[in-house]
Amino acid sequence: LRNRVLVIAEIGINHLGDEKYCKKLIIEAIKSGADCVKLQIINPEESYEKETKSFSLFKKYRLNFESLKRINNFCKRKNILLFATPGDMHSLNIIKKLKFPIIKISSGLNTNKYLINQSLKLNLPMIISLGMTNESEIKKIYKFVKKKNKNFALLKCTSIYPSGDNE
């Protein structure tokens, strides 16, 4: 994949916590020519206070381990890569157990050295989103990751929508 664009279909939590719907989205990604699909895995109990909207949202729309396992097998049968963004250590352990081939660090966690360091221990190709970071933070992220993993990509992205004309 080094000499071509990797097309990633971002499913995130748009599967609405529904395994069948997630598989339908994967089929659509395949039809559209995607090379891989990406999910977001978050354990709301570990990541958010119970009174927050984020807690309710991620609790409602999460896939359990068995569903993720079946979806992973489905993707293997369909010959499309599946990987995920972990939101916490529990989610990172799921990625490890399911042996996902790539790991993605979100913009919101790109300065979380502990999560990144634990992710680096999986020795996987890593994609790091750089939304909400300034030039100084980007340099620190680059240096930190480069010391431990030569197989990574930094993605410049917009975290505020709609983006300004200068972006």
Ranges and model annotations:
Residues 1-167:
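Catalytic cores and adjacent flexible loops of soluble metabolic enzymes
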